[in-house]
Amino acid sequence: MATTRSTTHRTQVVLVPGFAGFDALGQLHYYADVTPIFRDWARGWAAGAGNGAHPVLHYFDNLPTAGVATRAARLRDWLVKRVARGELQRGDRLALVAHSTGGLDIRQLVWDLVQRPDEVIPVDGAAGEACTVRARDVLGLLKRIVFLSVPQRGTNFASWVRAHGAARKALVADLRGAVAARDVPLVAQLQAWGARNAASLMRSELFLAIQDALTEMDPRASDDPKRVAAALEAWAEVELWLRYIWSDFAAIDDLVAGEDGDGATPARFDASTRKRETDGWETHGIETRSYATVGSRAFNLEHGVRAPQWRLLNPSTWAEPDGSATASPKTDVVYRMSYRACAGGPFEIPGGAATATATRFDSGEAQELEVWDNDGIVNTASMLWPDGPATRLVAGDHADVIGHFRRVKAVQPAAREYHTYDLLGSASGFREETFEAVWREVFEFCAG
């Protein structure tokens, strides 16, 4: 549909993180290298607008693993506060861009706003004196929503993590202990943990990222007062992040697939509720666009049927039914493990179809997807809503599309050695030109 872009007000783009998300932990950013693309795109857009109304990019920092309702409420409060303070003004064009679980947060937010448009929300003030903003004031600004790799119908990975809660708690406990024990160098502790628990993980870039983070938060690494202050700040951020994960892991319950219709989370809305949801978007002039990601196939699983669940104590479930793994030698162990966890489980393609179809981002051609196809975290067929077969399909893993698809040296002086990493190591062929093309298209849609 053709749209007319505003020539008098700003486009305000807000990036919302997904599960385990953050704006930044020390110098590690959730959305990595998106700002340079935005700045380059925005200069050209502002020149074309002819009025100097430069688009604005915001990064929202949410709780990492809290339930969707809690995360949505925090996003609402953040937006309402910006309205009250004049950062978001009447006539501005608000666009929310979300990766992964962040898309469910946005759906829950908009659902709540649409259901209670006259709700009065107090901001910044004492009882009886606070500024107030109505829900409809936020709805009136919101014009675009972009979904990136969002588990619109849940993910098998959540089911797998929930089934292995004891292992997850042990891992988080070990990491919290490493951060808390200031009397022993953190990197040495991490290496010792890896030697005890999973030596092969130490060769993955995810392990390298964790090691970098621990090095960065060690105040003994430098005598420079600014470096020491940055280390203490990074330490506090990571400690708080891990504390949140330890105390509130409700997001996993909201992401579990195969329980469609219970209404507890947007991932499990039934067909009639989803229709009411999209009708509400249309009523308020909100347009959406979905991007799905599909990683390289790490195992040779059976066509047209769900894969068996991966059970750590059952070796017969570790690879495909015939036991002959066909993983690319370039994929690392983290990707193979997460891919296998996501491949098997309760997720089904809506309507009981054997496969689904999406539109390749690079060529515009249709591509068939198996129920077990995934990006290492989310089943790809779960991302195909509300656009269905028109969903733009990007070849890449769950971290690629947010900038973590290659290892790049850090530019800013800090103890951290690298700025970004290939966190999942899927060998999916995701490149710099794809990253830039996707994000330029996202920003163009937000402002369109």
Roles of regions detected by a PLM:
Residues 120, 128-448:
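Helical cap/lid subdomain of alpha/beta-hydrolase-fold lipid enzymes
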Residues 4-94, 152, 163:
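Active-site catalytic motif of lipid deacylating hydrolases and related acyltransferases
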Residues 107-112:
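Active-site signature of alpha/beta-hydrolase-fold catalytic machinery across serine-
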Residues 98-102, 106:
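Gly/Ala-rich beta-loop-alpha elbow adjacent to hydrolase catalytic centers
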Residues 2-5, 40-52, 80-90, 113-138, ...:
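Alpha-helix termini
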Residues 71-79, 106, 438, 442:
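Generic hydrophobic alpha-helical segments
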Residues 20, 102-103, 152, 378:
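Short active-site segment of divalent metal-dependent hydrolases/proteases
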Residues 96-98, 148:
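Short beta-strand immediately N-terminal to the catalytic nucleophile in serine-hydrolase-like folds
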